[in-house]
């Protein structure tokens, strides 16, 4: 059991890396713990991650826990691309050596839940805390009424644009695109021999699927019928979205390969001049502020197809505990202490993550109120996200790996291999229906 030795005051938390941190330095390591007095926490932020403010937040999180609990947390940093698109996490679980605590997106939830890897956190949560989480980000962490993860954040997608690129192309605010046709036309004007006009994700993976869902939904497409029993992927909305993604590449206004970690990386792409517009999440605000503060940019809602209906897609990483941990009690207690407490220190911790260390939207009402009191959404891109981008939103769905792969294959075929959207959607729908006929797992949503 992770037994607290003394309470943490709000002042001591805000004090940062102080005496308590020096007395109990953060532990780091490469493998999962088999020590009953230690739990491992794998993440793609720190220590030593690309964004210092985010790395520091994770280091301080572990230090605060370690200073007040007998069971210690050992952090392991896994580079973002390896964590989200590589085999590191899956391989560790296949070998029976998965971390005690880790970060999980909705897109990968069913892989781990259906495999029996996720610990039920419900016994550790009060009804008050459960009601404090926004339902749209909790629903993909629930199976029945049981909670299997606590969200860190809400991360909507939008379109970032370079103000300098617009000025060079003699484009003004009135030229900002609102439709797909306008987006392609503006991207063409912004394209130069050294810069693409726009950028969408090209790397296959859960992140690309997540960004594609926004286009699909805006065009009226769906993956499943409303009862979740059959594929609806072979429909006109999906065809239109696949065609649009293909058009961006065949028109020469978007690259076949993104730079850096992927299209979730603002620093290697738009702020570095590789593209003039980029579909990107709210986290880009903090990235640019910390590492490219002189880059001038704006944010608008992602353009939608003519006759379509605007929406954004909501990403949201959650902290989860390994059901097969050697100390599941401590793993669960750590997750709930970090993100699921009514303690003022927990609220302040989450506020700092959501609006200082990594700009995003808080997943808890209490944290939203605290962020508003600090003026987090009063101006600039954060205000645009809160007031305009979030006008209509849908959370990232959770699909089993077989469904994800069918969708990914269709997107990759059309975007990069000049595949026929109708044929690609039909093939994916057939694969999904075949899989559904024998699926036996948690509800898909």
Model-identified regions with their sequence ranges:
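Conserved N-terminal structural module of periplasmic/extracytoplasmic solute-binding proteins
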Residues: 2-111, 306, 330, 419, ...
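Extracytoplasmic/periplasmic substrate-binding proteins
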Residues: 61, 211-214, 242-333
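Extracytoplasmic "Venus flytrap"/periplasmic binding protein-like
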Residues: 68-136, 140, 168-170, 175, ...
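Hinge/lid segment of periplasmic solute-binding proteins
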Residues: 107-158, 184, 208-211, 215, ...
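Extracytoplasmic/periplasmic solute-binding protein
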Residues: 143-152, 157, 167, 181-231, ...
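Conserved C-terminal helix/tail region of periplasmic/extracytoplasmic solute-binding proteins
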Residues: 167-168, 173, 250, 387-445
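Glycine-centered hinge/linker elements that transmit conformational signals in sensory
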Residues: 186-189, 227-259
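C-terminal lobe and pocket-closing loops
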Residues: 284-294, 305-406, 443-444
